[in-house]
């Protein structure tokens, strides 16, 4: 499958990124889109983000514009509400500043097959990033429930995935079928779609692993006084500050595991 570029040589593009998350929503997708948009802009591309409205200010980056659209504040249903408003904004944007490629961040935007086809015909080819799937998450919730994980039933978002994940999967299926290219964030994510969905026979899917923020996810520098003091303060706050732990020895009487939701 080929892209229908407007010229034979593309030096720079106007990329419209349709992402339900963008800072100040620093979730997994929001963080990735923020950094990806910045890198694309540094390479000379013009990037426009279409995301959900937020009361807090959006961080600015050179070469990156951010457009906000309204959305229904309801679990799962927000993906369809946001998707409709994002499509309207995408049409308006294309009239003002022609778009060369549309990048959708699934599953947080729900478009129908008809809408994907319209975008491809009237605006630009669509590249869909596969950031996991609703069915995959639903099956994960079921597995957690079988292991008596009570939080599965207490979180309204997880409960919505359990009850409506199958319904909203049809929008992901539309994206898989009608995008020029699908980009899975991992081999396991690609296998997830191959197992639970129906990719076309000539499915153009590439796996591009998401990067890691090396400034955050790195071994601690215990020779740096401020970092060591912060490390000790964290340990002390959880009453896990025996001498072995503070000296970062492999064996400690107070092992500490932090489970952080992102």
Q: Where do the model's predicted regions map?
A:
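A short, charged, and often flexible helix/loop element on the N-terminal side
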Residues: 63-94, 153-164
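Acidic anion/phosphate-binding donor-loop and adjacent secondary structure
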Residues: 194, 211-241
């Amino acid at each position: 499958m080929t892209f229908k570029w407007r010229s034979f040589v593309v030096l720079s593009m106007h990329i419209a990124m349709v992402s339900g998350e963008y800072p100040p929503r620093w979730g997994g997708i929001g963080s990735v889109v923020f950094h990806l948009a910045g890198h694309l802009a540094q390479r000379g591309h013009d990037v426009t983000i279409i995301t959900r409205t937020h009361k807090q200010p959006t961080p600015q980056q050179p070469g990156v514009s951010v457009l906000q659209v309204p959305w229904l504040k309801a679990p799962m249903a927000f993906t369809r509400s946001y998707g409709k408003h994002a499509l309207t904004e995408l049409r308006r944007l294309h009239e003002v500043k022609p778009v060369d490629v549309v990048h959708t961040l699934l599953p947080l935007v729900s478009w129908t097959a008809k809408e994907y086809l319209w975008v491809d015909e009237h605006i630009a080819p669509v590249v869909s990033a596969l950031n996991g799937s609703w069915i995959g998450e639903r099956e994960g919730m079921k597995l957690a429930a079988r292991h008596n994980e009570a939080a599965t039933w207490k979180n309204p978002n997880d409960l919505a995935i359990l009850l409506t994940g199958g319904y909203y999967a049809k929008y992901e299926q539309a994206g898989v079928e009608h995008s020029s290219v699908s980009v899975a964030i991992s081999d396991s994510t690609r296998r997830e779609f191959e197992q639970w969905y129906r990719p076309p026979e000539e499915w153009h899917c590439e796996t591009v692993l998401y990067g890691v923020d090396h400034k955050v996810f790195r071994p601690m520098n215990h020779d740096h006084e401020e970092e060591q003091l912060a490390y000790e303060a964290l340990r002390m706050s959880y009453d896990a500050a025996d001498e072995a732990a503070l000296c970062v020895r492999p064996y400690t009487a107070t092992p500490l595991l932090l489970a952080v939701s992102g």
